[in-house]
Design a protein with these regions (language model features):
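Short hydrophobic beta-strand element within catalytic cores of glycosyltransferases
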Residues: 348, 357-360
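Conserved active-site histidine-acidic residue motif and adjacent donor-binding/catalytic loop
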Residues: 303-304, 313-328, 339, 364
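Short acidic/histidine- and often glycine-rich active-site loop of Leloir-type glycosyltransferases
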Residues: 363-376
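A conserved catalytic-core segment of Leloir-type glycosyltransferases
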Residues: 35-97, 169
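Membrane-proximal helix-turn-helix segments that form the acceptor-binding/catalytic region
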Residues: 92, 148-221
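A charged, aromatic-enriched C-terminal amphipathic alpha-helix characteristic of glycosyltransferases
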Residues: 382-414
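Conserved donor-binding/catalytic core segment of Leloir-type glycosyltransferases
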Residues: 1, 223, 261-279, 285-288
């Protein structure tokens, strides 16, 4: 049985993609698979209830009127995120599905009672470290240029939650029209930097910090998706058992590609991702300014086109899965300059699968696949010689089928 954030199209991102692909492959390998995820807040009732919603090989159930999802800006009201519930509802659900093991992909939206009931029933629990929610109120552990993974205190939670939305507003995003609401978020006013507002956030997060630490203590095995994520978790948790298991998904496969870089007058250097500080977008712009324009072309993908960028940066905006081959055909060097301690980073494997050379920040978990020459601590370390000397990587990509076999073996040994 899996607990995940949800399914496409209502939820997106690497966590959702990975958990869905893993479940589908487990079904293909003959396993019976159940999925539980947070659902909408019912308007006509506040009663917490679990309902079976459909079955397409995976039996899917949803938690209605569960805990709020801290999808934006941290946690404003700590008490709302540790509300007690009827543990009997979880017990009835677990009795019905009778899982051999529970695989947890996130702590968002799930009550502590789920874990206490599972332990009472003797069900083993494994946890994949997709992000840092629970260790912190922000999945990234990062705000305004600072990673808080080494400074995790009550005051840190206050600072990380200075831009938090109200619980009522967060619950709006648990409706099925969430994707539309997400598009509208850019029109909603939010503070971008911590200022004197920090003095106004006097919430006490100590009990919530202990609440999540107790939940983590119920995990029988941690599946760390990189050395980096293991380092962050081990610094903030005690007495855990786990191992590094690099993740995959159904789109990661070795492709036969032609090296077009020799046919070009200039190497094409690109950034793929949101135009956000934590992803290193502005670091990429710094790099562009530092490199000679007569020797390199620059491009960005994966976010809305910006009006204020110089015309020597080609902006291709967002793209869909069908276009992905054409995207990578036009990239020689991909820069992955994340500032947050990114637990993995599927974009690295994706690029490598297309034969694209990757230069990644030390903050990217998937740097585990790169030679040290392709890893940088600061964007200023990258120069013309660094790019020309960057190494192409030859390595065996694990398919989702192979990865699933590995995960099932871990289940059997927990």
């Amino acid at each position: 049985m899996h607990y995940t954030l949800g399914f496409q199209p209502h939820r997106t991102g690497g966590l959702v993609k990975y958990s869905t692909d893993l479940m589908n492959e487990q079904v293909n390998q003959g396993h019976q698979v159940f999925a539980l995820s947070p659902a909408i807040q019912l308007c006509f009732s506040e009663k917490f209830v679990i309902r079976k919603v459909n079955s397409d090989g995976i039996e899917k159930s949803e938690i209605f009127n569960g805990l709020p999802l801290a999808l934006f800006g941290g946690i404003k009201d700590p008490n709302a995120f540790m509300t007690n519930c009827d543990g009997g509802e979880y017990e009835r659900y677990l009795y019905r599905v009778n899982p051999d093991i529970i695989h947890v992909h996130t702590l968002m939206g799930i009550h502590k009672e789920f874990f206490t009931v599972a332990k009472k029933l003797g069900i083993k629990i494994v946890f994949t470290t997709h992000d840092y929610y629970g260790l912190a109120p922000l999945p990234t552990f990062f705000l305004n240029g600072k990673s808080y993974d080494r400074d995790n205190t009550n005051q840190s939670w206050q600072e990380m939650s200075v831009n938090a939305w109200s619980t009522k507003k967060l619950k709006l995003f648990q409706f099925k029209f969430y994707p539309l609401l997400r598009k509208l978020t850019r029109f909603l006013k939010r503070e971008k930097h911590i200022s004197n507002n920090i003095a106004k956030n006097n919430q006490d997060y100590k009990n919530l910090i202990l609440y999540y630490k107790e939940i983590f203590s119920y995990m029988d095995f941690f599946l760390f998706n990189s050395q980096l994520s293991q380092n962050v978790y081990s610094h903030n948790l005690e007495n855990y058992v786990g191992d590094i298991i690099h993740i995959s998904n159904s789109d990661i496969k070795k492709r036969v590609v032609c090296d077009l870089s020799r046919l070009r007058d200039k190497l094409n250097i690109a950034y793929i991702g949101p135009s956000e500080e934590y992803k290193g977008y502005f670091e990429f712009l710094k790099l562009v300014e530092a490199l000679p324009k007569n020797k390199f072309n620059f491009s960005t993908y994966g976010h809305d086109i910006k009006e204020n960028l110089p015309n020597y940066i080609k902006q291709y905006g967002k793209y869909n899965k069908i276009e992905i081959s054409n995207v990578y055909k036009n990239i020689d060097i991909l820069i992955v300059p994340s500032l947050w301690k990114e637990t993995f980073g599927f974009i690295v494997l994706e690029a490598l699968s297309f034969g694209v050379t990757v230069l990644a920040s030390k903050n990217v978990g998937a740097k585990d696949f790169l030679p040290k020459e392709n890893i940088f601590s600061d964007i200023t370390e990258i120069n013309e010689n660094t790019i020309i000397g960057a190494k192409e990587i030859e390595f065996k990509l694990k398919s989702i089928k192979e990865h699933t076999f590995d995960i099932v073996r871990i289940y059997q040994n927990v």
